[in-house]
């Protein structure tokens, strides 16, 4: 293979390099994988309305997220068990994010602990949290994240049960024996037992609390001063509840299309959420972002920034830290080019008028120009 020219090319390399069980775990979605495909295809249906004859000799992509300044509105989403992809795992991802001047979100189910990731050096990091049946575990995780200098909690709210991921069932997916879920070492929650279907599905059924509700968001606010992002919101109704319950922000996410199939692509759900939020909290997006053009489209539809997941693990598998650095750089370069060719010199210049969605094509568009 010649020089890698875009983010997607890393996936084919990862597929060659990784054992089938591990590649399938990262790559697959729930059931028919309709939403998995739609997360990408929905971006392709959004077109640009570029503005011309604007001085774009200087472009500023910097932004702030929850008060933290970052170099670009492209951040790293939580992806579990990264040492399955590469021996350096989350260490490499943390270093790459820090070098790029952006945020890394560490998964609860990481194969490196919060303390280990913090030891890689300075960086703005968020901690993704699942709520366990044993609330003492949750409290302990939050305290450790605080002590390790993590700046926010990304609370995953779309996983009362694990989605039906048929590739994992076929492969009888289980965390390889040489790895553990490092944040749970010593809690007897760090290992995943072999199961007749998917070891992860059995693990979730045994540990994750299905009673999770908005009252638990309130409870979390009593045990930490860290801002709480609610990850997994795709409707206006839940957006309004997130605002009412004091969320610091929302991540529009369908869990990489790994939970409920036939939910909309996140880019399709974004505007509904943004409108319901009414500017009261920032709205972010993950799911299907593979190009700088995707980043621009998300911002034009009201996102404050995007998170990338699979591109990180695929590039990590292919080339370790250098791969993740390259993915972040390629997306940055593409996004900068898209801004220039659209006539935007800062993120504030990117407006709803820069894009045409399916709804616009049905005749809604002229009213807003």
From Swiss-Prot:
Q: Which reaction does it catalyse?
A: glycolate + O2 = glyoxylate + H2O2
Q: Which residues bind FMN?
A: 78-80, 107, 128-130, 156, 231, 253, 286-290, 309-310
CDD domains, alphabetized: alpha_hydroxyacid_oxid_FMN
Q: What is its EC number?
A: 1.1.3.15
Residues annotated as transmembrane: none
Q: What is this protein called?
A: Glycolate oxidase 5
Family of the protein in this entry: Belongs to the FMN-dependent alpha-hydroxy acid dehydrogenase family.
What Gene3D superfamilies has UniProt attached to this entry?
Answer: Aldolase class I
Q: Does the keyword Magnesium apply?
A: no
What does the subunit comment say? Answer: Homotetramer.
Cell location:
Peroxisome
User: What InterPro entries does this protein map onto?
Assistant: Aldolase_TIM (IPR013785), Alpha-hydoxy_acid_DH_FMN (IPR012133), FMN-dep_DH (IPR000262), FMN_HAD (IPR037396), FMN_hydac_DH_AS (IPR008259)
Q: Which residues participate in glyoxylate binding?
A: 25, 130, 165, 255, 258
Q: Which superkingdom?
A: Eukaryota
Q: Which GO terms of the molecular function aspect are on file?
A: (S)-2-hydroxy-acid oxidase activity; FMN binding
Q: In which pathway does it act?
A: Photosynthesis; photorespiration; glycine from 2-phosphoglycolate: step 2/3
Q: What GO cellular-component annotations does this UniProt entry give? A: peroxisome
Q: Return any one Pfam family short name.
A: FMN_dh
Query: Cofactor(s) for this protein?
Result: FMN
Annotated site location: Involved in determining the substrate specificity of glycolate oxidase: 109
Its keywords, alphabetically, are:
Flavoprotein, FMN, Glycolate pathway, Oxidoreductase, Peroxisome, Photorespiration
Q: Report the residue ranges that make up the FMN hydroxy acid dehydrogenase domain in this protein.
A: 1-360
């Amino acid at each position: 293979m010649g020089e890698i020219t875009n983010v997607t090319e890393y996936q084919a390399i990862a597929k060659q390099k990784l054992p089938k069980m591990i590649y399938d775990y990262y790559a697959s979605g729930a059931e028919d994988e309709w939403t998995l495909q739609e997360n990408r295809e929905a971006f392709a249906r959004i077109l640009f309305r570029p503005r011309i004859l604007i001085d774009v000799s200087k472009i500023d992509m910097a932004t702030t997220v929850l008060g933290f300044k970052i170099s670009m509105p492209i951040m790293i989403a939580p992806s579990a068990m990264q040492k399955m992809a590469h021996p350096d795992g989350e260490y490499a991802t943390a270093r790459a994010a820090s070098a790029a001047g952006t945020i890394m979100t560490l998964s609860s189910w990481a194969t490196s602990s919060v303390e280990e990731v913090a030891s890689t050096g300075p960086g703005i990091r968020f901690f993704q949290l699942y709520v366990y049946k044993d609330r003492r575990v949750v409290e302990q995780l939050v305290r450790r994240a605080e002590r390790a200098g993590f700046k926010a909690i990304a609370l995953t709210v779309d996983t009362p049960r694990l989605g039906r991921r048929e590739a994992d069932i076929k492969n009888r997916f289980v965390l390889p024996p040489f790895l553990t879920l490092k944040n749970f070492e010593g809690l007897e929650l760090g290992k995943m037992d072999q199961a007749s279907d998917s070891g992860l599905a059995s693990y979730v059924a045994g540990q994750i609390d299905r009673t999770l509700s908005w009252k638990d968001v309130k409870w979390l606010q009593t045990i930490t001063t860290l801002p709480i992002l609610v990850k997994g919101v795709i409707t206006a109704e839940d957006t309004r509840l997130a605002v009412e319950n004091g969320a610091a922000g929302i991540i529009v996410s369908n869990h990489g299309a790994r939970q409920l199939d036939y939910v909309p692509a996140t880019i399709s759900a974004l505007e509904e959420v943004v409108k319901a939020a009414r500017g009261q909290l920032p709205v972010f997006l993950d799911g299907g972002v593979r190009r700088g053009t995707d980043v621009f489209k998300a911002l034009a539809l009201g996102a404050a920034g995007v998170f990338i997941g699979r591109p990180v693990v695929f590039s990590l598998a292919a080339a370790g830290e250098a791969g993740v650095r390259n993915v972040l750089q390629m997306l940055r370069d593409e996004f900068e080019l898209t801004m220039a060719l659209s006539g935007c010199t800062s993120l504030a210049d990117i407006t709803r008028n820069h894009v045409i969605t399916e709804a616009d094509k049905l005749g809604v568009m002229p009213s807003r120009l």
